[in-house]
UniProtKB/Swiss-Prot annotation:
Topology term for the membrane: Multi-pass membrane protein
Gene name for this UniProt entry: yciB
Keyword vocabulary terms for this entry: Cell inner membrane, Cell membrane, Membrane, Transmembrane, Transmembrane helix
Known role: Plays a role in cell envelope biogenesis, maintenance of cell envelope integrity and membrane homeostasis.
Organism taxonomic ancestry: Bacteria, Pseudomonadati, Pseudomonadota, Gammaproteobacteria, Enterobacterales
Segments crossing the lipid bilayer: 22-42, 50-70, 76-96, 121-141, 151-171
Chief place of localization: membrane
Record family assignment: Belongs to the YciB family.
Entry's localization field: Cell inner membrane
Record's keyword annotation contains Transmembrane: yes
Listed name of the protein: Inner membrane-spanning protein YciB
An example Gene Ontology CC term for this record: plasma membrane
Organism: Buchnera aphidicola subsp. Schizaphis graminum (strain Sg)
Keyword ATP-binding: no
Disulfide feature: none
Length: 177
């Protein structure tokens, strides 16, 4: 159920963009993101920090897109989110005792600290790469291509990175046994 709730805003944005325009799609994105947070609260009695952060950035950048009738605001949203994630991961990599990914997952996944650092660094680079790639696509290519890239391209890259990380973790867990 959580996966469906997480995908609902992006696919709603895509559908409304296809039938209308980026401004109607931005309105729908704000509404569905807020509704998703409300459903999280009703079903799970909590809203996780990432979903709340996502809703706040969607509300801010979506509203700016609508108010100023300028699609650049919504296009920059994912770049800023991914850049923030990258910075947080890099900071945890170099200035904290444990990388942030390790803090979230070490209860369920038992691998050495060295491997956690590699995974954390991989994800920091991944988010940096995606934020730069989004800037390029948003600024240099037509809006329709950016929407497809945001919905399908970034989703595919995320899926691929999760798959690579999962394979790496499984390999390292087997190696350490």
């Amino acid at each position: 159920m959580k996966k469906i709730l997480n995908l609902l805003p992006i696919f709603t944005f895509f559908i409304f963009y296809r039938f209308y325009d980026i401004f109607i799609a931005s309105k729908s994105l704000i509404f569905i993101s807020g509704l998703t947070c409300l459903l999280y609260w009703i079903i799970y009695k909590e809203i996780d920090k990432i979903n709340l952060f996502s809703f706040i950035t969607i509300a801010i950048f979506g509203s700016l897109t609508i108010i100023f009738h300028n699609s650049q605001f919504i296009k920059w949203k994912i770049t800023i989110i991914y850049m923030i994630f990258s910075v947080i991961l890099f900071i945890s990599q170099f200035f904290m005792k444990k990388p942030i990914i390790q803090r979230f997952l070490e209860k369920d996944i038992k691998i050495s600290d060295l491997y956690w650092k590699k995974i954390n660094f991989f994800w920091a680079l991944f988010f940096l790469f995606c934020s730069i790639l989004n800037i390029y696509v948003a600024l240099c290519l037509p809006e329709k291509i950016w929407v497809n890239f945001k919905v399908f391209g970034l989703s595919f890259l995320m899926f691929l990175s999760i798959l690579i990380t999962s394979i790496y973790i499984n390999f390292k867990m087997l190696k350490e046994k």
